Amino acid sequence: RHWLAIAARLGLADPDFRDADGRSAYAAFLGLRLTQARLGAAREHDRLDVQTRLSRPGPARHLSVHDLLIGPQRIARVELLSTFVGRLRPGDNRSVARVSVPADTTGDKTGDAADDAADNGQSDGDTGLPPLAQRVRALRAGVDLDAEGLLAPPATLRFSFTPCPRNDFNGAGFLYFANFAAVLDRAAWDWWHEAPQQTTAVREIAWFGNLNVGETLHVGLLGVHRDGPGAGHACELRAGDGRLLARALTRRRPASASAPEPQP
């Protein structure tokens, strides 16, 4: 929905984005934020409706907000922030860099310098940024355990996973963004065998890069919730050579607490 919404905004029939030289460009995610999630409220045969809104908070940036509804009740909100990127070397996900898409910049009176300033924390203040952009900036700087209500883990925990090119990479050749979240859940299950009835209440991910086929993804535990890891935790995801690919925060709730909330 995010990519289709961008395509519709740019007047394209499909999300086939191109840079100034006609090469493929991609709306790659900088951040994801899942909030107000009561996923345990969903039942077999329920009809899930998704309401999507798209905005453009800055040059080359697009923010989509998706409300997930069962009837009149919202069971989750998902926010996605993307920027346009392309590969400097064909087939090499390590060579990804930000690019300009002429269809997006037509009539744009702001410059790329504004994007660079936001990336480097040089804006007029966080009050001018969407909440997801603020969280991406915070996670880029690191994880403040005290501010997040987390404690340093009592032991070093690691989890490794080598994605399969037939299942985990998308048609553009990138490790699919949803599979980063799946690996986080695999790691948590491996470490603690959380109760299956627990569901994710909040998840925030900030991305820094992507993997090539054949590389291994390593998850490291940064912090655990004061009420125990089952209540929440923070992780880093790195490539085998140590490259930082993502930081993530996860908070859980028991399935018994997952009744839907009225939509405001």
List PLM regions with ranges.
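Catalytic strand-loop segment that frames the active site of acyl-thioester-processing enzymes
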Residues: 1-5, 85-183, 187-193
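HotDog/MaoC-like acyl-thioester-processing domains
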Residues: 40-138, 211-213, 223-264
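Hydrophobic, proline/glycine-rich low-complexity stretches
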Residues: 1-49, 57, 184, 188, ...
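Short amphipathic beta-strand and strand-loop transition segments with alternating hydrophobic
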Residues: 31-38, 53-54, 204-206, 221-225
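A generic structural micro-environment signature
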Residues: 1, 35-36, 40, 48, ...
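Acidic/His-leaning functional-site neighborhoods
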Residues: 148-238, 242-244
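Residues in well-ordered beta-strands of folded domains
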Residues: 35, 79-83, 162, 206, ...
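Bulky hydrophobic/aromatic packing residues
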Residues: 18-20, 76, 84, 181
